[in-house]
Design a protein with these regions (language model features):
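Active-site phosphate-binding strand-loop segment of PLP-dependent enzymes
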Residues: 1-62, 67-74
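PLP-dependent aminotransferase class I/II
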Residues: 1-3, 8-14, 21, 37, ...
Length: 162
């Protein structure tokens, strides 16, 4: 599980090659990477599954919860069942299936309120990214005058500092 941390993308190339050699799936932990890029791709979209956190200290918050992204229909169906007590995704429309739980699952559903907050927050993502980058530049300018302070190399076209 590669982890994007503090607004910086993990170097996914070698990890992906190793996973492919051993026929392994990868889950990218992009909890700290929303809005960041690896090359020209958004972090969280480079593996079989990408996960994002919307907990309180993140760039977008719904209080708690998060988001899973995938372009694999089978994994999508599995995630959908896991978040709804193990029910099949179409179980709510079929009363006979509504009480069947073919797999172990959990209650990981967002409330409508959390979803509304998340949508409103997403609309502010670009502005927040710009603000974070401005703050980084200010801190770097002021703190770089101190000989005891060093900065990690940061490409602001790829990184959104937290």
């Amino acid at each position: 599980m590669p982890v994007d941390f503090n607004g910086r993308a993990v170097d996914i190339k070698n990890i992906s090659e190793l996973a492919n050699q051993h026929n392994l799936s990868l889950i990218e932990d992009a909890a700290h990477g929303l809005g960041c890029f690896y090359g020209k791709k958004h972090v969280g979209t480079m593996c079989d599954i990408g996960i994002f956190s919307f907990s309180t200290p993140k760039i977008i918050s719904t209080g708690q919860g998060g988001m899973i992204v995938t372009n694999n229909k089978k994994l999508y169906e599995k995630c959908k069942a896991l978040k709804d007590f193990g029910r099949k995704p179409d179980a709510k429309r079929n009363m006979r299936m509504a009480f069947e739980h073919p797999t172990i699952g959990y209650n990981f559903k967002f409330t409508e309120f959390q979803a509304a907050v998340g949508i409103a927050q997403m609309r502010k993502l670009r502005k927040r990214m710009i603000t974070k980058k401005k703050m980084f530049r200010i801190y770097k300018e002021l703190l770089s005058k101190l000989s005891s302070v060093n900065f990690i190399k940061t490409d602001l076209d790829r990184v959104t500092p937290w």
